[in-house]
Amino acid sequence: MTKIYDAANWSKHEDDFTQMFYNQNVKQFWLPEEIALNGDLLTWKYLGKNEQDTYMKVLAGLTLLDTEQGNTGMPIVAEHVDGHQRKAVLNFMAMMENAVHAKSYSNIFLTLAPTEQINEVFEWVKNNRFLQKKARTIVSVYKTIKKNDEISLFKGMVASVFLESFLFYSGFYYPLYFYGQGKLMQSGEIINLIIRDEAIHGVYVGLLAQEIYKKQTPQKQKELYAWALNLLQELYENELEYTEDVYDQVGLAPDVKKFIRYNANKALNNLGFDHWFEEEDVNPIVINGLNTKTKSHDFFSTKGNGYKKATVEPLKDSDFIFTEKGCIQ
């Protein structure tokens, strides 16, 4: 039988929330090049060797996770969901992960560090067993998603929410720690923009996962909940070791562990589940980094007040005249 292809009809809502998330994603859209980073150079030069090393490593770790989420995770989930609008929103989010978030970290590296140091930290990414396990565990769940199989899709969505609402935050901690003290503010501005993106990603995919979960029998729901908690525990135990490996040299590992437990509970909330970890007081400096005067840390806000969008000018014929060797003149 010949397949009938249908077009995306944006004049008709597929559900009561996807177009809202589309609009919010577009309102929040930003580009790495629109944020100047040179203002961080003076602070960076006065940081100790261990502080610089930890900062570089957490950003490199975030780069790996964003790369895999943009290249693998979101595209696979998008492929298996129904609805053109839902696919569009997920594909937009996938684009943000690699083309914007991962590139932003590279822009920070290029501003603050020499090429040799940048190359070293990307080699560290490939050799750090805790970071590699984190990526491998999440990607392996994505790879099990099967066509027309809602259970495997639900599990992939759970992995996605855990990545974006939980695992990223061990990396976000250190930039927020400085940002909350008024240091490395331009880099912190980028982190806040990324966090706001990840917030709506986690909420949106969480809503899609909840739809599938609610359709299951009580027994199947119990099985899926147990599976999700087992995955969370596996990721959490690895995250504790990763945190010690990266943050022990700056004496912040205990604080970071509190922060990741706090965000693990938020990830569970996004999936419609209750908190698993006990409530703890998170370092107020880091919370301050999420609630600075230049920011409204609310994923239903537009771009932060500290964000300056580039001026857009009409194209002129002269814009297409290139003088570089090998270009058309």
From Swiss-Prot:
Q: What else is known?
A: This gene has an intron within which is encoded YosQ, a putative homing endonuclease.
NCBIfam families for this protein? PRK09614.1-2, RNR_1b_NrdF
Pfam families attached here?
Ribonuc_red_sm
Gene Ontology biological process terms, A to Z: deoxyribonucleotide biosynthetic process
Identify this protein by name: SPbeta prophage-derived ribonucleoside-diphosphate reductase subunit beta
Q: Which reaction does it catalyse?
A: a 2'-deoxyribonucleoside 5'-diphosphate + [thioredoxin]-disulfide + H2O = a ribonucleoside 5'-diphosphate + [thioredoxin]-dithiol
Per the UniProt entry, what species is this protein from, by scientific name? Bacillus subtilis (strain 168)
The alphabetical list of record keywords is: Deoxyribonucleotide synthesis, Iron, Metal-binding, Oxidoreductase
* Enzymatic class: oxidoreductase
The entry describes its oligomerization and partners as:
Tetramer of two alpha and two beta subunits.
Coiled coil regions in record:
none
- State the needed cofactors, names only: Fe cation
Taxonomically, the superkingdom here is Bacteria
Annotated catalytic residues: Y105
Q: Which residues hold Fe cation 2?
A: E97, E164, E198, H201
What does the record give under GO molecular function? metal ion binding; ribonucleoside-diphosphate reductase activity, thioredoxin disulfide as acceptor
What does this protein's record comment on cofactor binding?
Answer: Binds 2 iron ions per subunit.
Q: Which InterPro entries does its entry note?
A: Ferritin-like_SF, RNR-like, RNR_NrdF-like, RNR_small, RNR_small_AS, RNR_small_fam
What family is reported?
Answer: Belongs to the ribonucleoside diphosphate reductase small chain family.
* Transmembrane intervals: none
Binding residues annotated for Fe cation 1, in chain numbering: D66, E97, H101
What task does this protein carry out?
A: Provides the precursors necessary for DNA synthesis. Catalyzes the biosynthesis of deoxyribonucleotides from the corresponding ribonucleotides.
Report the EC code(s) recorded for this entry.
1.17.4.1
Q: Name one GO cellular component term.
A: ribonucleoside-diphosphate reductase complex
